[in-house]
């Protein structure tokens, strides 16, 4: 099957390089576009008592995420069409990006690394209307 736009959902982890390499191996033969999406970390999850520093911490975490995506794209040896940093429910953002940017393949890794989440793995399915 020939894809035209591949969206890769990555986490800020070393495994994302392998995920992007797989996407590039699919995209390169057909010159498909490749875009990246990731979740921004929310500092409120880490410390609810440091309210005055939250905005600064949020900005630093966002910048680190941007830098990771830039470095990931540079090491891919393939042009990255767009990068998206989402917050909230990732599946909703993926669906919105797919609809708006005509994505026809989504590649995801495991964003949840706890033992319990691996043992009780589940998936959500959202369907986009056919074009």
Swiss-Prot record:
It comes from the Bacteria. The keyword rRNA-binding does not apply. The keyword Transferase does not apply. PANTHER family: STRESS RESPONSE PROTEIN NHAX, UNIVERSAL STRESS PROTEIN C. Keywords: Cytoplasm. It comes from Salmonella typhi. It is found in: Cytoplasm. GO terms for cellular component: cytoplasm. Signal peptide: none annotated. Its main location: cytoplasm. This is Universal stress protein C. The gene is uspC. It holds the Pfam family Usp. InterPro entries: Rossmann-like_a/b/a_fold, Universal_stress_UspA, UspA. Belongs to the universal stress protein A family. NCBIfam families: PRK10116.1 (NF007512). Required for resistance to DNA-damaging agents.
